[in-house]
Amino acid sequence: MSIVIIGSGQAGFEAAVSLRSHGFSGTITLVGDEPGVPYQRPPLSKAYLHSDPDRESLALRPAQYFDDHRITLTCGKPVVRIDRDAQRVELIDATAIEYDHLILATGARNRLLPVPGANLPGVHYLRTAGEAESLTSSMASCSSLVVIGAGFIGLEVAAAARKKGLDVTVVEAMDRPMARALSSVMSGYFSTAHTEHGVHMRLSTGVKTINAADGRAAGVTTNSGDVIHADAVVVGIGVVPNIELAALTGLPVDNGIVVDEYLRTPDENISAIGDCAAYPIPGKAGLVRLESVQNAVDQARCLAAQLTGTSTHYRSVPWFWSEQYESKLQMAGLTAGADTHVVRGSVDSGVFSIFCFLGTRLLGVESVNKPRDHMAARKILATEMPLTPEQAADTDFDLKLAIARHKDTHKDEVASADIGERQVVAS
């Protein structure tokens, strides 16, 4: 049996590794757009910006690993066509590779800013190692920076730039940072944190143009006509899923490649995982597409188990993290639609959690410097343990003890949830 994986990011890499760890003995071909071995992306906006770039430190495995595990790594040669009838993919150099099963792990790409000046030298995006190296070099030679977009990437870049002593202005179209992902309380905490560290936060502000001087980016003009001068500009306004290959071959797409709870497309010989996959979540209307290492890894492991004989649907509690200054933000669950937000701890102390409810149902938890709350939240969400807003607010209420008691009184249900988690979390 031959398995071809399109995309050598976290999801594609993990699929290849997990297939071997599950005993798959057939042919594995991992095809990636970028040159070199698969590498980690999260450090690019974190530790990588704080030190001299060392691409080797990002590698998920050294090149020899792929030879040792009989994984054919095809780098820097994008797939341009999928022939579903012939079950083969065609690369940009006209090479054809046949498959018995195809895994689409095509990921996502930067959303481009559609304004004049967006293509000027000195305008940076941040998703690849090459882009991180370019940004790091630029930050070393400039004294001021404008960051367009107050999402996770934008704010992590802003924090790194402030630590390097740059004057930083963040321009965000919405009225609060990380608004699509976080509660208003948590957004407010990070807005204050950045302001206290010297970042100029320009919220509810759009960008009209990126300005030029001597042929390079020199700042921006806002929609209200304000001119903000800077030596470089970083654009972090989200990503777009890479769904074109799937769409061209007739697979359904809907802000992602549409898959079922088993990560299968309507073509039984093609699956999709990671940032490019739109999949159903029980109890949530429509499809969800998540951009996280956890989702990429867990989906890859779940699919590898299926392809080697263990039939199981994908279920895993989503979790995310971000590091900004002294604050480590950890999120569990999906909190969109929450109508009640309960603070556990003290926001002013910088050590607290926000439990997000819809009625009496816990949707998710946002934690700052409280890893125990984060781990408890993942267990509560995985086992659907009842928790009231009053209990969440009470710091004397022992979450760990409540989880243990729930486990003892619901052994069969918890065991089933634990098995599902292990199937997607354990390597």
Curated annotation (Swiss-Prot):
GO molecular function: oxidoreductase activity, acting on NAD(P)H
E.C. designation(s): 1.18.1.-
Keyword Endoplasmic reticulum (UniProt): no
Cofactor list: FAD
One GO CC annotation: cytoplasm
Residues engaged in binding NAD(+): 144-172
UniProt: FAD binding residues: 2-34
Keywords attached to this entry: FAD, Flavoprotein, NAD, Oxidoreductase
Family matches, as InterPro entries: FAD-oxidoreductase/Apoptosis, FAD/NAD-bd_sf, FAD/NAD-binding_dom, FAD/NAD-linked_Rdtase_dimer_sf, Reductase_C
Keyword Flavoprotein: yes
Job description of the protein: The degradation of the thiocarbamate herbicide EPTC by cytochrome CYP116 (thcB) requires the participation of a flavoprotein, rhodocoxin reductase, and an iron-sulfur protein, rhodocoxin, to mediate the transfer of electrons from NADH to P450 for oxygen activation.
Family: Belongs to the FAD-dependent oxidoreductase family.
Listed name of the protein: Rhodocoxin reductase
